[in-house]
Amino acid sequence: MQVGSKKASMGKQQQSVSDATSPRPPLAPSEKNNVGSVTRRARTMEVSSRYRSPTPTKTRRCPSPIVTRTAPSSSPESFLKRAVSAERNRGPSTPTTPVSDVLVDLPVSSRRLSTGRLPESLWPSTMRSLSVSFQSDSVSVPVSKKEKPLVTSSTDRTLRPSSSNIAHKQQSETTSVTRKQTPERKRSPLKGKNVSPGQSENSKPMDGSHSMLIPPQHRWSGRIRGNRSFDLGDKAVRRVSLPLSNKSSRHKKSSSDITRLFSCYDNGRLEVSSSTTSEDSSSTESLKHFSTSSLPRLHPMSAPGSRTASPSRSSFSSSSSSNSRGMSPSRGVSPMRGLSPVGNRSLVRSSTPPSRGVSPSRIRQTAQSSSTNTSVLSFIADVKKGKKATYIEDVHQLRLLYNRYSQWRFANARAEGVSYVQSLIAKETLYNVWHAISDLRDLVTTQRICLQQLKLEIKLRSILNDQMVCLEDWAMVEREHISSLAGAIGDLEANTLRLPLAGGTKADLGSLKLAMSSALDVMQSMGSSIWSLHSQMEEMNKLVSDLAVIAKTENFLLDKCENLLASTAVMEIEERSLKTHLIQKKQEEEVRDDAESSPLLPLSKFQWP
């Protein structure tokens, strides 16, 4: 009953996992590369349920990345399980040294160099480094092509399970009646690396260094006939026993070898590079930036020479590590084994198999030990860790967006400051221009006012010049007018003030009338006589005015004569001097003539005083 219930529960889990995962393409093209002699097993397998196991399960907790732990021990039977090759058979080879012992004895750095990642790899849900999101300084990790396992014996690109896997299949068939241990969580196997079967995918790196995640090689179990279960231990044994050069020396590297990989340290940024020694690796190396403080928690990534994983089982780490998961030139990739795109976090969550059962085509039987028992709590913890990783990734994205927002704010503030300064300069320039224009307007206004005043003055002067003749005539008319007014005033005074009007005087009106009339007659007679004399006086006045003009002309002529007399005196003196000079010249000529006429008797010359 228990076996039947286990089968039913396992069938439900397989159906739920197959429904949850992405649909695969048919595996028909891979049939031509495999040998048909190997009989196919049924697609359903008896896999013990991890939830209904009567044995007490032990919760597997993720080890701390700081505390170094040894790999869990496993039974030697797990190292006999190897993939069976479709073309050739290999003899069952047992490792001379248990893999778990090798992992314990080897240094952490040598294990990392030989396997490409630590023995305990992160679960896909926790592969994403949580501390990388908060570090501004990143580390460039070019993945080396040295770590790619070489296949020199054949160019076939099919999966070749080893004979140890056949032996393991026979052993599993003989022991199918007994109840199997609760299988461990499925994880991405390490390609050709020493991995203990007891190591779960949820475990973290043992030391503080980074690790490399190698995608699984035998994800597509449909390409292998007769065996649908794979073990990680037998692949590790097979990779250890490969007769390739420089393979055994990888496991003997000390921890000092990795110090040569850290080449430059500049401002908190490390660049770790590995030398490429594979002669048939032609794919380009990809860079992975990570923080030095988050090396213990760095999510692994696959080497360029490793095989690609299936889309439903690939471990997606980040968009930057997708380039490092290329294909080896010597190992082609079938259309059904192509590399799926990387960069969607939903694929990371969907690739983790938490508490959803195990597909029959993906089951890997591990060693039957008590250390492989897992519980539901570990799956819940994995889910929580995956959510935490996504939350921290969202926080990292938010911080990046906030940094970009801060940069744009700074750029906008700087642009606003520049525009504000430019506006101030423009305003100041406009104010200066306005002030200069206002000054020019004031100057033009004052000049216009002055010009208007000058025009008014010129007009006033022209009017006054026209009135000057009338004003000059007015002076003469005013003088005559004043004289006539003075005569009229004298007559009125003589007629009024000389009469005895005060002291009670009395006069006879008849006699007064007669006296007044007689006085008037006398005055009229006097006026007629004065009028006759007045004409004579006017003539005399005219003669006197002519005489004044003549006298003035005479005075002018007298002044002129005086000047002429003064000049005549000077001219007279000059005339006398000239005459004297002429006389002297004449005398000199005469003496010279006399000397020429009588040369024997020279005459003495006497100078005139």
UniProtKB/Swiss-Prot annotation:
Transmembrane segments: none
Bias (Polar residues) ranges: 11-21, 46-57, 151-180
Region span, Disordered: 1-227, 271-369, 588-609
Coiled coil: none
Highest taxon above the source species: Eukaryota
Pfam families, alphabetized: QWRF (PF04484)
Record motif QWRF motif, residues: 407-410
Stretches with biased composition (Low complexity): 98-110, 129-143, 271-285, 302-332
Family as reported in the entry's similarity comment: Belongs to the QWRF family.
Record protein name field: QWRF motif-containing protein 4
Species the sequence originates in: Arabidopsis thaliana (Mouse-ear cress)
Gene name, Swiss-Prot/TrEMBL: QWRF4
